[in-house]
Amino acid sequence: MELQLLNTLRNHNPIVFNIANFVTVQDVANGLNALGASPIMSAEVQEAETMVQIAGAVCINLGTLTTTQIDQMRVVGKLANQYHKPVVLDPVAVGAVPYRKEVALALLSDFQVDVIRGNAGEIAALAGMDWQAKGIDAGSGQGDLVEIAQACAQQFQCCVILSGPTDVITDGQRVVKVANGTPLFQRHVGSGDLLSSIVAAFTAVSPTDVYQAAQVACLVLAGAGELVASQLTADRPATFAIDLIDRLSLVTVSEIQTIAKVD
């Protein structure tokens, strides 16, 4: 795994254009900024082309979608393809809300996505496989997570991150698992949104190998969270959220390498 991409990201300070979830937009902006990327958000379709042109990558989040925003997503996705900018899709709650799944599938047919990042329920829904999702949470099911992720990647010809206690990253054939992290991520709304945008940041500095970028993104965020949790003396979700921003700013390649649990 090319963990030196973290240093590359910090040296290049890539702009990440986010069509954001308004519930978590501040956390995403702060996390990207701390890591070394430059976040930019917009809900205005009239400036879509300029935003795509100046960005290194685009992250499209379905968290708080509206009809107007869906139109913007479609325009932005097509422009990103036109200008050869990587696109990351976060299909929030598509496993629990049929309309969201309908929207996500329509977007995936309108433009090419480079990475889809979702939990088990979301990825299973896109792949057409059985899973009982629970709102924005993964829910439960009996399917093999690797097979679910691979099926989704093959169907949409992209890289897929099925995130959870162990992140599964696949391009449809190759598979990497990242087992770092902490249960405190599940107590912090927006952890998945932040991961999706961090993935976009890494694809901006590795556009020809988004599979590698996805792996590094998962390991950096999971590793940073694990390091924060190891210093806490109690279950403190709010402290974790604040300290995570600090750690994203300070974490080094060597620190991540030391604790990496990658299969």
From Swiss-Prot:
UniProt cross-references to Pfam families, sorted A to Z: HK
Superkingdom, natural source: Bacteria
Pathway: Cofactor biosynthesis; thiamine diphosphate biosynthesis; 4-methyl-5-(2-phosphoethyl)-thiazole from 5-(2-hydroxyethyl)-4-methylthiazole: step 1/1
Residues reported to bind substrate: 41, 190
Cofactor or coenzyme needed: Mg(2+)
Chain residues that bind ATP: 117, 163
Catalysed conversion reaction: 5-(2-hydroxyethyl)-4-methylthiazole + ATP = 4-methyl-5-(2-phosphooxyethyl)-thiazole + ADP + H(+)
Family: Belongs to the Thz kinase family.
HAMAP family: Thz_kinase
This protein's name: Hydroxyethylthiazole kinase
Organism name: Lactiplantibacillus plantarum (strain ATCC BAA-793 / NCIMB 8826 / WCFS1)
